[in-house]
From Swiss-Prot:
<feature type="transmembrane region" description="Helical">
    <location>
        <begin position="330"/>
        <end position="350"/>
    </location>
</feature>
<feature type="transmembrane region" description="Helical">
    <location>
        <begin position="87"/>
        <end position="107"/>
    </location>
</feature>
<dbReference type="InterPro" id="IPR001750">
    <property type="entry name" value="ND/Mrp_TM"/>
</dbReference>
<keyword id="KW-0472">Membrane</keyword>
<keyword id="KW-0618">Plastoquinone</keyword>
<keyword id="KW-0520">NAD</keyword>
<keyword id="KW-0812">Transmembrane</keyword>
<keyword id="KW-0793">Thylakoid</keyword>
<keyword id="KW-0150">Chloroplast</keyword>
<dbReference type="GO" id="GO:0015990">
    <property type="term" value="P:electron transport coupled proton transport"/>
</dbReference>
<keyword id="KW-1133">Transmembrane helix</keyword>
<dbReference type="Pfam" id="PF00361">
    <property type="entry name" value="Proton_antipo_M"/>
</dbReference>
<feature type="transmembrane region" description="Helical">
    <location>
        <begin position="386"/>
        <end position="406"/>
    </location>
</feature>
<dbReference type="InterPro" id="IPR010227">
    <property type="entry name" value="NADH_Q_OxRdtase_chainM/4"/>
</dbReference>
<feature type="transmembrane region" description="Helical">
    <location>
        <begin position="305"/>
        <end position="325"/>
    </location>
</feature>
<comment type="similarity">
    <text>Belongs to the complex I subunit 4 family.</text>
</comment>
<keyword id="KW-1278">Translocase</keyword>
Length: 500
């Protein structure tokens, strides 16, 4: 057990500091913005320091763990802890949230509440990724929903209330199944709740009950990932939300579902995962094709990028279902890669739409000359998203490919069919992304309009884009830097999986 509560400080600091926003002097929005950015930077620096000096990469066990009694009557403990599986998403959360705060600079209406909600969301997400207690995991899952709902309903497009209501209905419905699974696993076989991950990992369940638990958790995660057909909230939400909120949704929120699928379903319920894994692979394969095909028909720029996110998450689902070291490492790599790429694409789409006051692709065209910097950055991230070699998207999808090909779970013919369909999806990806670039930046449609909104990207947009582009290139050139974080933990999960 850690003697200094590093993780407690990391989880509590953003929301605690966020409460102070309401007591800042009323001297305009600039004070609130700089205060929030400083809090995010301090949190990111603290995380980096703790993980560099107090985390051992070659140790697959839980590290920096803490255990404090919280509610005695329920035997509920505050149990944070991290391992190789959680350190990547936590660092991604800190990085993307800091940049999303900078991206939210133009927000002026209710600025204090907006930035407090971003910091509250920050704490909820880090708390979830560092939880090693089932009930704490559920509480952090719910804590993160409230700020997202308010961010969606108060800042965004004309249909923001509709999209926010749809989001909360889907996620709250999934949370019911998550709570039932948590309580079922915690109360099984004992008069006292056993909510600790380590205790639950050593618990044996009847196969039928394990399948029931697995299915309940899967529904909750299928909403967040999302898995078709529980994905319809995502395009509407992205289409109406402010682009800084979209960065948090695409960069972090979707990753929570995949993280829970590995952390709870795969690690704690291995027999049920073995039964469900072929269906996960099938769902992921169909999702790649369906979402890519649907994205091609979208005329709303943000919705097209949203469907591309759904398609790319299909590779993560396939990697998790492959039950191989390579496949699971590829799924984790795809999570981090898409976290960067999804956030960058929504940021650039939002800044572009703010400048030209248009959102529909058939109304755009010809803005590459007046906005060359945005054109260059948008094209670069689109190339990374369509898996151009040398960038993170290519490495992640290639590793998932090798994972499913080398899987012992599937026969030769199904593996050939799966890889063939995945290849079709990878062909559709450049079609809808390149056609999107053509509709936005090429042609002559907007040349005759006034150029009052055609100011190219400034230092803020360039800084955010370059900060995201560096890890995209870094992962593409040297993926072992990221894979080294999770490889030992992945081996530990799969060794327990096969020998239990």
């Amino acid at each position: 057990m850690s003697y200094f509560p590093w993780l407690t400080i990391i989880v509590v600091f953003p929301i605690s500091a966020g409460l102070s926003i309401f007591f800042l002097p009323h001297r305009g929005n600039k004070v609130v913005r700089w205060y929030t950015i400083c809090i995010c930077l301090l949190e990111l620096l603290l995380m980096t320091y703790v993980f560099c000096y107090h985390f051992q990469l070659n140790d697959p066990l839980i590290q920096l763990d803490e255990d404090y009694e919280w509610i005695n009557i329920f035997d509920f403990h505050w149990r944070p802890g991290i391992d190789g599986l959680s350190i990547g998403p936590i660092l991604l959360t800190g990085f993307i949230t800091t940049l999303a705060t900078l991206a939210a600079w133009p927000v002026t209406r209710d600025s204090r509440l907006f930035h407090f909600l971003m910091l509250a969301m920050y704490s909820g997400q880090i708390g979830l990724f560092s939880s090693r207690d089932l009930l704490l995991f559920f509480l952090m899952w719910e804590l993160e929903l409230i700020p997202v709902y308010l961010l969606l309903s108060m800042w965004g497009g004309k249909k923001r209330l509709y999209s926010a209501t749809k989001f909360i209905l889907y996620t709250a419905g999934g949370s019911v199944f998550l709570l039932m699974g948590v309580l079922g696993m915690g109360l099984y076989g004992s008069n006292e709740p056993t909510l600790n991950f380590e205790t639950s990992a050593n618990q044996s369940y009847p196969v039928s009950l394990e399948i029931l638990f697995y299915f309940g958790f899967l529904i909750a995660y299928a909403v967040k990932l999302p898995i078709i057909p529980l994905h319809t909230w995502l395009p509407d939400t992205h289409g109406e939300a402010h682009y800084s909120t979209c960065m948090l949704l695409a960069g972090i929120l979707l990753k929570m579902g995949a993280y829970g699928l590995v952390r709870i379903n795969m690690e704690l319920l291995p027999h049920a995962h073995s039964i469900f894994s072929p269906w996960l692979v099938l769902a992921g394969t169909l999702q790649i094709i369906y979402a890519a095909s649907t994205s091609l028909g979208q005329v709303n720029l943000k919705k097209r990028i949203a469907y591309s996110s759904v398609s790319h998450m299909g590779f993560t689902i396939i990697g998790i279902g492959s039950i191989t070291d390579t496949g699971l490492n590829g799924a984790i790599l795809q999570l981090l890669s898409h976290g960067f790429l999804g956030a960058a694409l929504f940021f650039l789409a939002g800044t572009s739409c703010d400048r030209i006051r248009l959102i529909y692709l058939d109304e755009m065209g010809g803005i590459s000359i007046p906005m060359p910097k945005i054109f260059t950055m948008f094209s670069s991230f689109s190339m990374a998203s369509l898996a151009l070699p040398g960038m993170s998207g290519f490495v992640a999808e290639a590793v998932v490919f090798f994972g499913i090909i080398t899987s012992q779970k599937f026969l030769f013919l199904p593996k050939i069919l799966i890889t063939f369909v995945m290849a079709i999806g990878m062909i559709l990806t450049p079609i809808y992304l390149l056609s999107m670039l053509r509709q936005i930046f090429y042609g002559y449609k907007l040349f005759n309009m006034t150029n009052s909104y055609f100011m190219d990207s400034g230092p803020r947009e360039l800084f955010v884009s370059i900060c995201i582009f560096l890890p995209v290139i870094g992962i593409g050139i040297y993926p072992d830097f990221v894979l080294s974080l999770s490889v030992d933990k992945v081996e530990a999960i799969l060794s327990n999986y096969f020998y239990r």
